[in-house]
């Protein structure tokens, strides 16, 4: 049998053992808990002196400070230049984390290595010392096991009745002398020969502190037994928790304590309550304190230190990966810790709804308590819904949290007025103030998908809250109390109304105060950039007056955009110095992220797609633009006889074409308006992606007109210079609809011939929407659907007709794309673009 196979088999049997043990513990614990009278447990909890409860929680929080002795020994042994106060802070965070998700202490060992390797260049010795600390966590229990075997901590009622307990104690007791002998005989450093002994003493003190906290919890719930006997039961339970490899020994530890104390004639209700208080005091309270400490400890200070540390050596085999992520992870620890604290706060006060309900049942003024219940439930739900926003550093989410904390505090003061909980709310409020000051964005964009998820989550949470309250009332058997059930019936709707009012008012005020700032168009600067660096097929639309412009810091490039429905819709590619496009887009994305807006690019070319891709965008092909090569365009030849026939027809009718250069007279503009109004026939003008029929815009470029034999204007088209590559485009094309003449053909042909005569090389006839989109079965589903629309909905919109019409001019087809950010919906982005185009 190979070594690899042996290792796999060992891992497999370990997994089977751990799984079987876990299932056994769960079923046994369930069987024991099924006999417990939860009403009696709640009654016992109500009798507890609140001062003793505060002292228990304080003791649980302070007990973890003893574990800092491990880190002090480590720092002294390695002679690390690290402030003592920081050692205590870091150690507390590590040990609190290790107690919850320890997996035998390996999580704590990993975090220690991660933190302390930045203070030393001898990582080998660091790992060896951390290994001693990891193993010594068991040696403390080994020492206590020896005392249990010697009956100093008397647990004979368990040892004599359960044979496997005796054998576990003997095995663990033998581990201590072996460990001490090995670490003294073969020390990591001869100058620190007794490192294992020191760590064993700390481990023993640690376990005794934990036993003392549990014993104090037992005394509070009126359990009175010998301390020596209690410690004996605790040691056996701790060993069971370690063997189970379940983080914190959850389940296995509690089951052994429950069975051990039950065998002494103590009621199960008291034991359960003592265990819950112990878990809260020794695990939950330290974690909350650790989260608060981490919001200060890890952040800009740690990030700056890592940037400047000469001892920064990433872990072997993950060098490049860790170097790129370690600093970013540390920088996110404060916001992540605050988000966890907010989530836990909401859960705590959701559970505290039981207190409001219970007090309200025995109070004559039911209505006030139901209002307080609805307010607190609404505030807790609002906290949960904004946890992600707080993690992302959104000021609006933090403001929602501010309001929620104030509402929870008000409900708490009016009802049960717990000093401990009010103190906690004050701490959270202070942390939120600090988070607001360092927030990176004003708000995060809301999307239909996100709103739907939040709605479903709200319904689910409110349903769970209802189940919790109703289940507790049933367990306490309080339905015999006469209450106003109509108020309970409308409690759900009261909560919904309060949430809607809070969200609506704050969102409106926030949007009103931080409305998207208008970047005034400096046409002089735009002209200078276009004249120096050139434009594109859409750059002339900067003069339409319905868009804002965003310039880069050097003022040598800009983009045209318009704000609509929390989105910044950009028209075309950036304009200006191509070397500045990346910095321009980076600044624009930072601006949009701070404001909480989505970014959508409309009608971009494929030239800069790698640049858009770098910003995490997705692409959708809108269609293709028809670009005619004027160097090869001609009306001569057999295939072009249709063009000649059209031109000859206009000549026979004495219809003339001419180009009018600006400035234009008022009479000329009145003629244009007459034709335009007839062509529109009451329809609204389109915006954004086409020019505006205004005297200011039309005066920026020449206009081609067609007149009949009497000199009356019957058609016109406005030109769009591109200011680059000798290309030109056409914008507005309008004619008198009552005339049965191919006026659009006439305008295009005359414009093509005029452009060629003037030396232009290319002519843009515009886009054929959805043309050549999703034609392959390998294409994205959304593009294949768009392709089917192109093929089968020609009656609603002339998709195919537009392409066939432009095909007769033999153009080169260039693709145009819609660019939108990842995690955003294509259809929602398209809808916003259409709203920009259709509405002024």
Swiss-Prot record:
GO term, biological process aspect, one: lipid metabolic process
Name under which the protein is recorded: Phosphatidylglycerol lysyltransferase
Functional note: Catalyzes the transfer of a lysyl group from L-lysyl-tRNA(Lys) to membrane-bound phosphatidylglycerol (PG), which produces lysylphosphatidylglycerol (LPG), a major component of the bacterial membrane with a positive net charge. LPG synthesis contributes to bacterial virulence as it is involved in the resistance mechanism against cationic antimicrobial peptides (CAMP) produces by the host's immune system (defensins, cathelicidins) and by the competing microorganisms (bacteriocins).
Family: Belongs to the LPG synthase family.
Reactions this protein catalyses: L-lysyl-tRNA(Lys) + a 1,2-diacyl-sn-glycero-3-phospho-(1'-sn-glycerol) = a 1,2-diacyl-sn-glycero-3-phospho-1'-(3'-O-L-lysyl)-sn-glycerol + tRNA(Lys)
Compartment(s): Cell membrane
Chief location: membrane
Membrane topology, from the record: Multi-pass membrane protein
Transmembrane stretches, start-end: 9-29, 53-73, 90-110, 130-150, 162-182, 201-221, 230-250, 271-291, 338-358, 367-387, 393-413, 416-436, 451-471, 490-510
Any matching Pfam family: LPG_synthase_TM
Extracellular topological domain: 30-52, 111-129, 183-200, 251-270, 359-366, 414-415, 472-489
Segments in the Cytoplasmic topological domain: 1-8, 74-89, 151-161, 222-229, 292-337, 388-392, 437-450, 511-840
Source organism superkingdom: Bacteria
The protein's enzyme class: transferase
Source organism: Staphylococcus epidermidis (strain ATCC 12228 / FDA PCI 1200)
């Amino acid at each position: 049998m190979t070594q690899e196979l042996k290792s796999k088999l060992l891992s497999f049997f370990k997994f089977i053992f751990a799984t079987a043990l876990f299932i056994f513990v769960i079923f046994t614990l369930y069987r024991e808990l099924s006999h417990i009278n939860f009403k009696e447990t709640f009654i016992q909890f109500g009798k507890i002196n609140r001062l003793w409860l505060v002292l228990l929680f304080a003791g649980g929080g302070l007990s973890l400070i003893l574990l800092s002795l491990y880190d002090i020994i480590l720092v002294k042994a390695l002679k690390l230049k690290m402030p003592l106060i920081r050692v205590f802070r870091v150690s507390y965070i590590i040990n609190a984390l290790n107690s919850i998700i320890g997996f035998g202490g390996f999580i704590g060992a990993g975090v220690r290595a991660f933190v302390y390797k930045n203070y030393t260049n001898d990582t080998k010795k660091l790992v060896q010392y951390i290994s001693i600390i990891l193993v010594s966590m068991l040696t403390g229990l080994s020492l206590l096991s020896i005392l249990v075997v010697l009956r100093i901590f008397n647990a004979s009622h368990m040892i004599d009745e359960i044979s496997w307990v005796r054998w576990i104690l003997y095995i663990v007791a033998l581990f201590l002398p072996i460990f001490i002998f090995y670490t003294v005989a073969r020390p990591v450093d001869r100058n620190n020969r007794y490192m294992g002994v020191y760590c064993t003493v700390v481990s023993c003190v640690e376990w005794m502190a934990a036993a003392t906290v549990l014993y104090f919890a037992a005394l509070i719930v009126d359990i009175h037994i010998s301390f020596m006997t209690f410690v004996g039961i605790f040691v056996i339970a701790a060993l069971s928790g370690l063997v189970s490899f379940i983080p914190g020994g959850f389940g296995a530890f509690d089951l052994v304590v429950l069975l051990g104390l039950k065998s002494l004639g103590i009621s199960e209700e008291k034991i359960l309550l003592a265990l819950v208080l112990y878990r809260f005091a020794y695990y939950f309270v330290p974690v909350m304190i650790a989260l608060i400490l981490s919001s200060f400890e890890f952040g800009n200070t740690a990030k700056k230190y890592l940037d400047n540390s000469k001892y920064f050596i990433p872990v072997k085999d993950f060098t490049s990966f860790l170097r790129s992520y370690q600093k970013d992870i540390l920088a996110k620890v404060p916001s992540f810790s605050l988000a966890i604290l907010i989530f836990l706060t909401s859960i705590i006060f959701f559970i505290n709804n039981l207190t409001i309900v219970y007090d309200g049942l025995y109070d004559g003024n039911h209505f006030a308590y139901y209002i307080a219940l609805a307010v607190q439930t609404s505030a807790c739900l609002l906290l949960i819904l904004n946890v992600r926003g707080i993690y992302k550093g959104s000021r609006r989410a933090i403001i929602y949290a501010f309001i929620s904390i104030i509402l929870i505090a008000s409900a708490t003061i009016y009802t049960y007025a717990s000093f401990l909980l009010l103190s906690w709310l004050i701490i959270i409020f202070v942390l939120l103030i600090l988070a607001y000051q360092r927030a990176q964005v004003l708000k995060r964009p809301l999307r239909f998908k996100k709103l739907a998820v939040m709605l479903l989550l709200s319904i689910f949470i409110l349903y769970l809250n209802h189940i919790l309250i109703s289940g507790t009332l049933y367990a306490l058997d309080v339905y015999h109390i006469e209450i106003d059930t109509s108020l309970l019936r409308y409690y759900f709707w009261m909560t919904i109304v309060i949430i809607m009012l809070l969200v609506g008012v704050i969102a409106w005020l926030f949007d009103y105060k931080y409305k998207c700032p208008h970047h005034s168009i400096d046409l002089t600067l735009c002209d200078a950039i276009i004249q120096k660096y050139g434009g594109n097929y859409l750059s002339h639309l900067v003069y339409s007056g319905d868009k804002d412009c965003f310039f880069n810091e050097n003022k040598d490039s800009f983009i045209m955009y318009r704000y609509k429905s929390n989105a910044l819709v950009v028209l075309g590619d950036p304009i200006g110095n191509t070397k500045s496009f990346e910095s321009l887009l980076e600044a624009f994305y930072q601006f949009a992220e701070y404001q909480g807006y989505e970014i959508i690019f409309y009608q971009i070319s494929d030239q800069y797609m790698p640049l858009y891709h770098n910003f995490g965008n997705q692409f959708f092909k809108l269609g293709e633009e028809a670009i005619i090569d004027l160097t090869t365009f001609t009306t001569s030849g057999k295939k072009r006889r249709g063009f000649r026939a059209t031109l000859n027809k206009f000549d026979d009718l004495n219809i003339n074409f001419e180009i009018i250069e600006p400035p234009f007279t008022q009479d000329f503009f009145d003629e244009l308006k007459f034709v335009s109004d007839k062509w529109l026939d009451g329809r609204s003008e389109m915006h954004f992606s086409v020019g505006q029929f205004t005297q200011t815009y039309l005066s920026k470029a020449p206009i081609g007109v067609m007149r009949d034999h009497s000199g009356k204007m019957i058609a016109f088209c406005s030109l769009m210079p591109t200011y680059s590559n000798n290309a030109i485009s056409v914008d507005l094309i309008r004619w008198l609809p009552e005339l049965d003449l191919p006026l659009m053909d006439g305008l295009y042909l005359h414009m093509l011939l005029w452009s060629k005569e003037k030396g232009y090389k290319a002519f843009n006839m515009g886009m054929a929407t959805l043309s050549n989109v999703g034609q392959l079965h390998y294409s994205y589903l959304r593009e294949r659907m768009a392709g089917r629309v192109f093929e089968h909905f020609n009656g609603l919109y002339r998709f195919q007709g537009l392409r066939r019409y432009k095909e007769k001019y033999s153009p080169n087809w260039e693709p145009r794309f819609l660019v939108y950010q990842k995690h955003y919906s294509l259809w929602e982005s398209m809808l916003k673009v259409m709203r920009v185009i259709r509405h002024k």
